[in-house]
From Swiss-Prot:
Pfam families: Pan3_PK. GO terms for molecular function: ATP binding; poly(A) binding; protein kinase activity; zinc ion binding. The N-terminal zinc finger binds to poly(A) RNA. Contains a pseudokinase domain. The protein kinase domain is predicted to be catalytically inactive because some of the residues important for catalytic activity are substituted and it lacks the equivalent of the binding site for a peptide substrate. However, it has retained an ATP-binding site and ATP-binding is required for mRNA degradation, stimulating the activity of the PAN2 nuclease in vitro. Regulatory subunit of the poly(A)-nuclease (PAN) deadenylation complex, one of two cytoplasmic mRNA deadenylases involved in mRNA turnover. PAN specifically shortens poly(A) tails of RNA and the activity is stimulated by poly(A)-binding protein PAB1. PAN deadenylation is followed by rapid degradation of the shortened mRNA tails by the CCR4-NOT complex. Deadenylated mRNAs are then degraded by two alternative mechanisms, namely exosome-mediated 3'-5' exonucleolytic degradation, or deadenylation-dependent mRNA decaping and subsequent 5'-3' exonucleolytic degradation by XRN1. This is PAN2-PAN3 deadenylation complex subunit PAN3. Residues 507-545 form a coiled coil. Its main location: cytoplasm. Residues 546-648 are annotated as: Knob domain. Keywords: ATP-binding, Coiled coil, Cytoplasm, Metal-binding, mRNA processing, Nucleotide-binding, Zinc, Zinc-finger. Homodimer. Forms a heterotrimer with a catalytic subunit PAN2 to form the poly(A)-nuclease (PAN) deadenylation complex. Interacts (via PAM-2 motif) with poly(A)-binding protein PAB1 (via PABC domain), conferring substrate specificity of the enzyme complex. It is found in: Cytoplasm.
Length: 648
C-alpha cells in the first residue's frame, strides 16, 4: 500500500519532463515551468517552449480536449502497477488545452509565469466598448443557452422588449414608466439600455446641516423648523417700514413717484453739507413698483442740464456694497419751489452714524455718547476703504464723508448715501482736479474716524493733535497711526492713495472679510432650510382643494368616496390629532414631517383611522402620494374643460 501511494524515486523522475515528440512541441509551454517555475532539462534537450511570455500557437486552441492534465485522475488502490504507469505524462496530455466553458467567446490561452500567485494589478477593469444591444452575436461565437452561456451575449433578446425613448417627467411617482411608455432620462444616443430610472439628486430631500448656533433647549423645537426669531422680527420690521405711509401728509405726488414719506428725524434746515437745505423721503415708483429714497435739495436752480447727464452717467457705473446706488436726478416744482431730486436705493430702518454714535443722550443729566468699540471702528474703516477704492478707481471722488450722510443698517453695515450730489451742485464752480478731491477724501475719512472715536462731531475738532493723543488711552497704537496717516498731508512731490492705506491695514481687512464670510454662511444656512417650505405649502394647498369638495361633475360625495376618503383621513392624521386624554396635539414637527413625507412619497407605512374607529387603512406614503396626484389631476382636467362646479 505504501508503494502504491509513494512510488519509488526512479518512477517519480519520469514526471520531470515529457518525452520529446519533435518540433511540433516547440510552441507548447513546458509543464515544469508551470509547476516548479523552471525546467532542469531545458539545456539537456527538452523541446518544449520555456518562454513564458510567448503566445501559444493558435492551432493549439482547437486541439483535442479529451484530457485535462490539471484534473485529478482516478487511481484504484488495488492496482499499484497501473498507478506507476499512469504517473508518466504522455505527450498527448501535455498538449491538452485548458478547460473553457461554452459560450464565453473566443478563448485566450495566454498565461503568466506567476499563474498561481494573485496579482491585483494584473486585473483590468471591464469597460464595454462598441456594445450594441440589438446585436445578438456580438462576440463572434454562436449563441448557446447552456449552463455556461454568457449573460452579456444573451442581452440581445431584450432589445425587442425595451420601450423606445420618450419624455422624462421629474415629478412622476413611478420612475420605471416615466412620461408614458418608453420614457427614459438619457437620449437614445448611447448604447446602454434604459433600466429602472431614478430622479436626479437635486429633486430629493436632503437636510442642510452645515451650520448650527448655540441655543437653549427650549429654543430648539421651533428653531429646527424656522428661521431664528430675531432674524424674522428684523425682516418683518423692514417690510413694515417699506410699506409705511402717512395719510394727509401734505406731500405732493411727483411725476413717477407717489406715497412720499419723510425719513428725516430732525426738522431743522441744515445747509452745511451741500449749501442748500436737504430732505429725505421714501417714495414708490409707479413704473417699477419699487421703493426708493429721494433726497431733495430745496431752492436749487439748475443752470446747466449737462451737469445731471454727465454726473449720472459716471456714477451709475459704481456698483459697490458700501455705496448706495444712485439711479437718476431730476428737477421739480411740485414742492412750491425749484428743487433738485436724487433717487437712491432705499434701505429700510437705516440710521446715520450721526444718529447712532454722536447723538447725545438725554436723561437726568446731559452726557456725551459712549465710546465706540475698536473692533466696530475697524469694521467702519474697512468698509469705507472698500467704497473709496471703487470710487477712486473710476476716477471719481466721494466728497461727502460726514456722519450724517453715511447710513448704518444691521450688523454694522454702512453705506455712503450722498455721493454725486456735490458733483452736480458744484459742476461749474468746482476748480479742483479729481486727484485733489481724492486727497480730500482721505483727510475727511481720517476726521470721520477720529470723530467717532472721540465722540465729538468733525466740526468741533479744533485741535487735531490733542484728539489724536487722546486715542492712546482707549484704542491701540495701530488705530491711532492709521488715523494720523489719513489726516496728515502728503509729503512734497508725493501723493497718498487708498491703495497705500489698504496695504497698511491688510490684517484688519482679512479679519473683517472672515466675519463677512461667516455672516454669509449663516444666512445661506437659513435660506437653504427655508427652501423646502414651498413644497409643503404647495402640498397643503393641493390637499385643501381636494378634501371636503363636491365633484366637479355635480356629485356632492366626491371627496368622501374612493381615494379622496383616504386623503381625508390623512388630513385628520396630520392636523386633527389628539392626545390620550382628548387634548389637541399641536406638534408642528409632526405636521411638517408628514407633509414632507407625502411630497417625497417614501415607503414608510402609516395607519389611518376614521373618527368613529370603524375604518382603518394601512398605507404607505408612496401610495398616498399617488392617490393625491390622481385626485388633483382630476380637478385640473375638469378645470381645463370648464366642467360645472370646477371653481367651487
Amino acid at each position: 500500500m505504501a508503494a502504491t501511494r509513494y512510488p519509488p524515486n526512479d518512477l517519480r523522475r519520469q514526471v520531470g519532463s515529457p518525452r520529446s515528440k519533435g518540433r511540433e512541441n516547440k510552441d507548447t509551454l513546458c509543464r515544469n515551468i508551470l509547476i516548479y517555475g523552471n525546467c532542469r532539462y531545458e539545456d539537456q534537450g527538452c523541446t518544449f517552449n520555456h518562454d513564458q511570455n510567448k503566445n501559444p500557437s493558435p492551432q493549439a486552441d482547437f486541439s483535442k480536449k479529451t484530457f485535462n492534465v490539471d484534473s485529478p485522475a482516478f487511481t484504484p488502490s488495488s492496482q499499484p502497477q497501473v498507478l506507476a504507469k499512469k504517473t508518466t505524462l504522455s505527450s498527448q496530455a501535455a498538449n491538452a488545452a485548458p478547460f473553457t466553458p461554452r459560450g464565453a467567446g473566443t478563448p485566450n490561452l495566454q498565461q503568466t509565469a506567476e499563474a498561481s500567485v494573485f496579482n491585483p494589478a494584473a486585473i483590468r477593469e471591464f469597460t464595454p466598448q462598441n456594445y450594441d444591444i440589438g446585436n445578438t452575436n456580438s462576440n463572434g461565437v454562436p449563441q448557446e443557452n447552456g449552463i455556461y452561456s454568457d449573460p452579456f451575449t444573451t442581452m440581445g433578446s431584450l432589445g425587442s422588449t425595451l420601450p423606445s425613448a420618450g419624455q422624462y417627467n421629474l415629478y412622476a411617482s413611478d420612475h420605471n414608466s416615466l412620461g408614458g411608455p418608453g420614457a427614459q432620462f438619457y437620449p437614445q444616443h448611447g448604447s446602454f439600455p434604459a433600466g429602472p430610472l431614478q430622479p436626479p439628486n437635486y429633486h430629493l430631500y436632503q437636510p442642510h446641516d452645515s451650520y448650527r448656533q448655540e441655543l437653549q433647549p427650549w429654543q430648539r423645537a421651533t428653531y429646527d423648523f424656522f428661521i431664528p426669531a430675531k432674524m424674522r422680527e428684523e425682516l418683518q420690521k423692514k417690510m413694515f417700514a417699506t410699506q409705511q405711509v402717512m395719510p394727509n401728509s401734505g406731500l405732493p405726488q411727483l411725476e413717477r413717484w407717489h406715497s412720499l414719506f419723510p425719513l428725516d428725524t430732525n426738522n431743522r434746515k441744515n445747509t452745511s453739507s451741500f449749501g442748500y437745505p436737504s430732505w429725505v423721503y421714501k417714495a414708490q415708483n409707479s413704473r417699477t413698483a419699487r421703493h426708493y429714497a429721494l433726497r431733495r435739495l430745496e431752492g436749487y436752480r439748475l443752470t446747466n442740464e449737462k451737469a445731471i447727464l454727465t454726473v449720472m452717467k459716471e456714477w451709475k457705473k459704481i456698483k459697490n456694497g458700501n455705496v448706495v446706488t444712485v439711479h437718476e436726478a431730476f428737477t421739480t416744482r411740485e414742492f412750491g419751489d425749484s428743487s433738485l431730486i436724487f433717487a437712491y436705493d432705499y434701505h429700510p430702518l437705516s440710521k446715520t452714524l450721526q444718529e447712532h454714535h454722536l447723538q447725545p443722550t438725554h436723561g437726568n443729566r446731559y452726557r456725551a455718547p459712549s465710546a465706540v468699540p475698536e473692533n466696530v471702528l475697524w469694521g467702519y474703516i474697512c468698509q469705507i476703504t472698500n467704497a473709496l477704492k471703487t470710487i477712486h478707481s473710476n476716477k471719481l471722488a466721494a466728497r461727502c464723508l460726514e456722519p450724517s450722510k453715511i447710513i448704518l443698517s444691521d450688523n454694522n453695515r454702512i453705506r455712503l448715501s450722498a455721493c454725486s450730489i456735490l458733483d452736480v451742485v458744484q459742476f461749474e464752480s468746482n476748480t479742483k482736479s479729481v486727484a485733489e478731491l481724492q486727497q480730500e477724501d482721505l483727510v475727511k475719512f481720517g476726521k470721520l474716524i477720529l470723530a467717532l472715536a472721540t465722540g465729538a462731531p468733525p466740526a468741533h475738532l479744533n485741535n487735531i493733535q490733542v484728539a489724536l493723543d487722546s486715542l492712546v488711552t482707549k484704542y491701540s497704537a495701530n488705530l491711532k497711526d492709521a488715523v494720523a496717516w489719513l489726516i496728515a498731508p502728503s509729503n512734497p512731490g508725493e501723493s497718498k492713495s487708498i491703495e497705500n492705506f489698504i496695504s497698511g491695514i491688510a490684517t484688519h481687512m482679512t479679519a473683517f472679510f472672515d466675519l463677512a464670510l461667516q455672516d454669509g454662511d449663516e444666512k445661506q444656512f437659513h435660506l437653504a432650510r427655508e427652501l423646502e417650505n414651498g413644497r409643503i405649502a404647495r402640498s397643503m394647498m393641493k390637499l385643501m382643494t381636494i378634501i371636503e369638495r363636491a365633484e366637479p361633475g355635480g356629485a356632492q360625495s366626491w371627496s368622501e368616496t374612493g381615494e379622496r376618503y383616504q386623503l381625508k383621513l390623512f388630513r385628520d392624521y396630520v392636523f386633527h390629532r389628539v392626545e390620550a386624554d382628548g387634548k389637541p396635539n399641536l406638534a408642528v414637527g409632526h405636521m411638517l414631517s408628514c407633509l414632507s413625507k407625502l411630497d417625497a412619497g417614501i415607503d414608510e407605512m402609516v395607519v389611518l383611522t376614521s373618527r368613529d374607529n370603524e375604518t382603518v387603512f394601512v398605507l404607505s406614503y408612496r401610495e398616498l402620494k399617488q392617490m393625491f396626484d390622481r385626485a388633483f389631476n382630476e380637478l385640473v382636467k375638469h378645470s381645463k374643460t370648464g366642467a360645472p362646479g370646477a371653481n367651487n
